[in-house]
């Protein structure tokens, strides 16, 4: 069970991070691509993410919810700051985990009284840390645009199953210990809604996914809903840290 939950959480985080990239003469594709390019140049973002999972394991159902408040800011080419507070609710229990990245250290508070820190080189993840708030159109096989009552662009899209399955396989490469040698995972359906304002800022992204997975000989059918709302980007972002980081135990 622990292995199944671990891979489910890893998969959801990978997919949620992948899913979330005026003039009337412009096509919907051109408007979306312009917002995507702008999002890729961001050096800071503040967002709230919610993930809801419903799983069916051989007739046994299990629901899990997770929320995350995150602030990420690039200080320089070699330094970044991050604050993320995650709240997970499963089987009637809530677990709150805090993670921070500052001054070359990764800090973690497991919510049970353990507070640790460890040296961490930003350069190790710099190539993977591009802040992108919109889903790449390379994954899509359908994209439709309307406008809401505030004049924002609302994009409804469908993700191509083969492309996303290939992306998921690559993203989770090296995590065989989670699903085991005989484990597998396949996305059966994935759709989303992305809201972009007139200045090409991504305001929110919602994704619905249906997935089947096998781990530890157990077949799991899963429905996942991910919602991300961006509160601020760029200079408007301030990364907030707790006052007691100096008291964390180095490991």
What spans do the regions from the language model cover?
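Subset-of-secretome marker
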Residues: 21-251
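Enrichment for repetitive, rod-forming helical segments
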Residues: 9-10, 105
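C-terminal motif of bacterial Sec signal peptides marking the signal peptidase cleavage site
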Residues: 16-19
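Positively charged n-region of N-terminal signal peptides that target proteins for export
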Residues: 1-4, 8-9
């Amino acid at each position: 069970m622990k292995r199944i939950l671990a891979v489910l959480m890893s998969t959801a985080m990978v997919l949620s991070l992948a899913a979330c990239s005026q003039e009337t003469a412009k096509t919907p594709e051109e408007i979306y691509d312009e917002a995507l390019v702008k999002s890729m140049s961001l050096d800071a973002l503040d967002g709230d993410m919610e993930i809801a999972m419903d799983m069916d394991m051989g007739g046994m159902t299990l629901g899990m919810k997770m929320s995350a408040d995150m602030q990420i800011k690039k200080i320089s080419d070699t330094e970044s700051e991050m604050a993320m507070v995650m709240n997970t609710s499963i089987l009637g229990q809530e677990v709150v985990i805090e993670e921070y990245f500052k001054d070359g250290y990764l800090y973690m508070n497991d919510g049970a009284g353990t507070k640790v820190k460890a040296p961490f080189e930003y350069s190790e993840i710099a190539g993977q840390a591009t802040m992108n708030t919109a889903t790449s159109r390379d994954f899509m096989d359908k994209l439709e645009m309307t406008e809401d009552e505030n004049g924002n662009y609302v994009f409804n899209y469908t993700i191509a199953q083969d492309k996303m399955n290939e992306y998921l396989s690559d993203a989770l490469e090296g995590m065989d210990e989670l699903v085991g040698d005989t484990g597998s995972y396949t996305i059966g359906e994935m759709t989303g809604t992305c809201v972009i304002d007139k200045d090409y800022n991504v305001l929110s992204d919602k994704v619905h996914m249906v997935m089947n997975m096998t781990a530890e000989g157990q077949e799991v059918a899963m429905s996942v809903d991910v919602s991300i709302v961006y509160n601020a980007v760029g200079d408007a972002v301030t990364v907030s840290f707790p006052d007691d980081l100096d008291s964390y135990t180095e490991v």
